[in-house]
Amino acid sequence: METIAKHLDVCQEQLLELYEENSNKLTKHIQHWKCIRYECVLLHKAKQMGLNHIGMQVVPALAVSQTKGHQAIEMQMTLETLLNSDYGTEPWTLQETSREMWLTPPKYCFKKQGQTVEVKFDCNADNAMEYVWWKVIYVFDTDKWVKVTGHIDYKGLYYVHGGHKTYYTNFEKEAEKYGNSLQWEVCIGSSIICSPASISSTVQDVSIAGPASHSSSSTTTTLAQASSTLPIGTAEDCVDAPPCKRPRGPPTNTNNARNTVCVRNSDSVDSTNNNILPNSYNSNKGRDNNYCTATPVVQLQGDANCLKCLRYRLHAKYKTLFVAASSTWRWTCSDTSSNALVTLTYVDEQQRQQFLNTVKLPPKVTYKVGYMSLQLL
């Protein structure tokens, strides 16, 4: 017993010295795991001899010391192969060569330069999880170590080796565990990466991907139904769209440069009139006709939290594609949908079309295009 106690004291003293030294050399960390391995051997032998204590230290069960000893052997041999590679002379901290780091995703790889990313599930800041994006990853390939770069996209955290992507964190699977829908946002500092649901819609409601084409049964379209031109004549009521900018000079004849759009009588965005009013018409006879403008708008409809997240993303990434965005609002009528609304305004139809061609909406957010007749004072 005295011999085991003496050897154990020497081993633990070496461990304390290594911890205090806090070296960045790989050889020191290999020595650290050798000491842990030797400590497990001594404790295992002491338990076999029937000892429950060595001084003030409790002797663990045989299975505990055996398992920990096997782990120490694994780490020692792994670090020795890393030492003999091209990366053996790089600075390595004790934390980077720890067992915990070895088993942190991606497992059985060494990693450096970790950065925390936040994933908000269901567009809800209160339902967020943090993950570590490793920018440098060391992967063992057959008989040698390979240094690769870590990446991040909407799907998850991954690295590329041999031309193949290996995801070690899949955000879709995480969304199934922590969210109520397959929708999430990845926040990296001030940058936001959208979930696939925000990039490509598969539901029947609209996803902004191009100019909208109307069907005979609905005012919304799917991504596959979007076309590059608007229909000139349909079974719906067709009216002439006004020029979108207020004329600076005398009124001009717009008959030769008229855009035709189809608007459903029941779903007009302009609540004051079911039809679109051209600039040459003004219901207020006491004012100059030139001051009446029909402003192009897009009305978004969906869950209030999703709309708030979307509005924040629009201001952060696409603020040049629209003029203004309203706060989240609702109709007060009791027989209307409980969905929230956000209204976007544009300088002209060209800016609105550029917005529709560029921005992608979450699948549960629909939109309607139209005009809002404003009386400019």
From Swiss-Prot:
It is found in: Host nucleus. GO terms for biological process: DNA replication; DNA-templated transcription; regulation of DNA replication; viral DNA genome replication. Its main location: host cell. It comes from the Viruses. The keyword Iron does not apply. Phosphorylated. Residues 294-377 are annotated as: DNA-binding domain. Residues 251-260 have a biased composition (Polar residues). Residues 241-260 are annotated as: Disordered. Pfam families: PPV_E2_C, PPV_E2_N. GO terms for molecular function: DNA binding; DNA-binding transcription factor activity; nucleotide binding. InterPro entries: E2/EBNA1_C_sf, Nucleotide-bd_a/b_plait_sf, Papillomavirus_E2_C, PPV_E2_N, Reg_prot_E2, Regulatory_protein_E2_N, Regulatory_protein_E2_N_1, Regulatory_protein_E2_N_2. Keywords: Activator, DNA replication, DNA-binding, Early protein, Host nucleus, Phosphoprotein, Repressor, Transcription, Transcription regulation. Binds DNA as homodimer. Interacts with protein E1; this interaction greatly increases E1 DNA-binding activity. Interacts with protein L1; this interaction enhances E2-dependent replication and transcription activation. Interacts with protein L2; this interaction inhibits E2 transcriptional activity but not DNA replication function E2. Interacts with protein E7; this interaction inhibits E7 oncogenic activity. Interacts with host TAF1; this interaction modulates E2-dependent transcriptional regulation. Interacts with host BRD4; this interaction mediates E2 transcriptional activation function. Belongs to the papillomaviridae E2 protein family. This is Regulatory protein E2. It comes from Human papillomavirus 44. The gene is E2.
